[in-house]
């Protein structure tokens, strides 16, 4: 068939008519929020999926009109044009392979995701091959009776599909290559693990220890390689485009109900709120979100009903599997939110193998550049603001050279703030600060929310940032302004290495003295591993301001004099009551910390009482207290059958959450002065305000135009689909992104115990509980499950004691003696912990190791000359409940140990003197080496002189003793038998020995199983009879004989078990014989 010629005027007319069908004459207000309406009549037919007949889309104008009309007729409110879906928080996600190498690889999960990904890619390839065949046959039919223009367009589409298919094939080859490399590293790691077990079981010699160290190094290397391959494979998973279709529930959703849906996928988050309208319509403030697929994480969905000012009712929370979403066709997913399934969340999920932004044509770059030049020309025509105190000579703008580096959010924020402050010189105008143009605002509107929620800066490696709000000192009798000083504090540096102040800085100080006022200096820098922090103090006689600089190898980019702002000396006395507040960028949301610290400053310890651990304690907490509690509750809810220990833990965690929420509500009822201080502090960040702006705020110097150009380029790069005014006022954005604020639908303030050091300790123990539950659900023997449940019960008791003793009284959790009275009864151990931590609730592992080395290494060297520090590391690892292999893969400066772990260890081992305990442990290590050396005379000598009460005992020692029961020397076997038989009367030793030997029965090495069987026989461990019965059917004749002999030594219970074991096979043999005869006779 022939297609009519369509001119450019006809196309413009058609586009105008289509736009009039979709939008009214007045258009859509640029300030209207992004609303998506979901009704019962879905567009595109019963499936709700619209797909064109070809890759580029051969849909007619009537079809497009009908689809638009059917969709818009279902909307309850006006809509703006559908914008590009925004991506959630991507800080730290898929940034580099170094971030992925720190996590533990998950081979089974990688295998599952790889199979699903490969199937999805093959399905994509088949779909496009079918599309290509269809277009190719269509082109052959149209060659004779069609115009050249139509054939040209069709040929372009065919070539586009062919290029896409070649890209898919290359993508598949990369996926296969990465997975093959992952499998190779997995097999190498499994081999290293088996070698480690072999060297561990062999006699300890110098060569064995060196080989074991090499195997451990290889094991760590293979593990890191697996994590690297896993991270690279994760980067090739594409994108999930999730569209909100609304909630569904018969007689459950009523008009006027408001709901909040929170989706969490690893570090990516999507929060949207909606309202149930009349006529089965719903309005939501979000339509579509892009999630980057992850390998190890699942999608957590939580639906909350908003009933009042601060009353939120949890409707339900579910965890969704993601490997089934790798399909070529979009899927409509109905998620049962509650247990009964009366409320369902309808989502449309589409998977794209590549980033959609990568598929744009090259012509798009020309249009972007044209739009960029047009916006720059428009914004440069405005009238600049009237400058304030512009006649001051040292207030001049000097454009900085960025040396080809792309600016981050923090650099952009810093430059905009400094330029505004330069012209205003009034801290009172800080609340009105905002970026300079509409194009500048698009940078903030399209930024990942993780910038506000997790404090990320969008780069792979970030140095620690710390914002300090302190009082500004002045000698004037007039009170200083209530706005606190904002300073970025770097890690401590040597004061002697600080450069002297420049002449311009001295002018700043002199001017500050003349005006008799405080100052503020702000310096925020991009994080770069090649850059180092340096500190320049510019402190006048009557001011206490500190200017910071970023020092590189060749130049010093210091805070210029234009960065200094003078405060007006007309404020209230309430500022004098504020205490310095330390905030850390690595902890998470800076605004969340700000509100928590300002609202609970009366309960914090004095600054003078805090050591370095107190100042930096928040850097150790990767997640907030609320996030860890919710994560643990979600994991507990995901378990089907829960035993008593898990139920008790869940009840205690929920009780803890309720107590902390009560504390937050109590904080809300504080005096109005502090509330106004918090509100004022939040308003100080309104320079991020994107709800309104000044079109004529264009600046008056050369630096302004360059920054406007950068904002436009950055906006185009990050995507201009989202409207720059969609975020609204910063207070609204903070309420939505961080859960703080005082809006009607806002979430409560962050949960806290009132002491940030105690917060960190509680978070570590909650994360430990989460880890134990993960181990519990990952398989293992029955004895291992019993051990995990016992540890969970211990953590439950700890949380219960903390809740009853501390959280119900505001002033009861400020020091260790208040929280752990039992530790005060041991003065020497209390002093040891205070020296390691400064009296706080946690400290770093590196500090503990160094202090214990200085205190006890000299005495240990006399007992264990070759490795005295190994005993100290052994004790600390047991405090933290981790293996030596895991401890060697992390840095001691990053690991944290809590006072509760320290106290649990000394209670379990009944320690009153740590030095004596270490000496006994060193002697036990020497005993283990003597028993494993293979010298019968030395082994006999050590067995005769060792005291059972002095042994801890360690698993390695117990296995070394059991190994002597399988030697060929009868004298050694008799001495070992007598030793274990006498040790059976010592209950602590017997309990640990039975657990150790029972666990050893499930190992793969025959030598270890034989020795453990013989040791259980000596201990008369009847409680291990089930594990011994399993070995009676072993293929190995010697092991089977030892298991039977051990079973017969267990008295009456063992004899009955052996008789049952002996009769069952005979009955089965007789039954099989009768059946065989019957079959033979019939034929």
Swiss-Prot record:
Q: Where is this region: Disordered?
A: 21-48, 71-111, 471-508
A Gene Ontology molecular function term for this protein is: 14-3-3 protein binding
Give the InterPro entries listed for this entry: ARM-like, ARM-type_fold, FAM65_N, RIPOR3
Q: Where are the compositionally biased (Basic residues) regions?
A: 81-92
Out of the domains of life, which is the source?
Eukaryota
Keywords (A to Z) from UniProt: Cell adhesion, Cell membrane, Cell projection, Chemotaxis, Coiled coil, Cytoplasm, Cytoskeleton, Differentiation, Hearing, Membrane, Myogenesis, Signal transduction inhibitor
Q: Which GO terms describe its cellular component?
A: apical plasma membrane; cytoplasm; cytoskeleton; filopodium; stereocilium membrane
Task: Write out the tissue specificity statement of the associated record.
Answer: Expressed in the eye, nervous system, and skeletal muscles. Expressed in the otic vesicle.
Q: Which GO terms describe its biological process?
A: cell adhesion; cellular response to chemokine; chemotaxis; negative regulation of cell adhesion; negative regulation of establishment of T cell polarity; negative regulation of protein localization to cell leading edge; negative regulation of Rho guanyl-nucleotide exchange factor activity; negative regulation of Rho protein signal transduction
Q: What happens when the gene is disrupted?
A: FAM65B morpholino knockdown leads to significant reduction of numbers of saccular hair cells and neuromasts and to hearing loss. FAM65B knockdown also results in abnormal muscle, with low birefringence, tears at the myosepta, and increased embryo lethality.
Q: Per the database entry, which stretches of residues form a coiled coil?
A: 206-240
SUPFAM superfamilies in the cross-refs? ARM repeat (SSF48371)
What binding partners and quaternary form does the record give? Homooligomer; homooligomerization is regulated by RHOC and leads to the formation of concatemers through the association of N- and C-termini.
Q: What does this protein do?
A: Acts as an inhibitor of the small GTPase RHOA and plays several roles in the regulation of myoblast and hair cell differentiation, lymphocyte T proliferation and neutrophil polarization. Plays a role in fetal mononuclear myoblast differentiation by promoting filopodia and myotube formation. Maintains naive T lymphocytes in a quiescent state and prevents chemokine-induced T lymphocyte responses, such as cell adhesion, polarization and migration. Involved also in the regulation of neutrophil polarization, chemotaxis and adhesion.
Q: Which family does it belong to?
A: Belongs to the RIPOR family.
Query: What is the protein's given name?
Result: Rho family-interacting cell polarization regulator 2
Q: Which organism is it from?
A: Danio rerio
**Organism phylogeny:** Eukaryota, Metazoa, Chordata, Craniata, Vertebrata
Protein's gene: ripor2
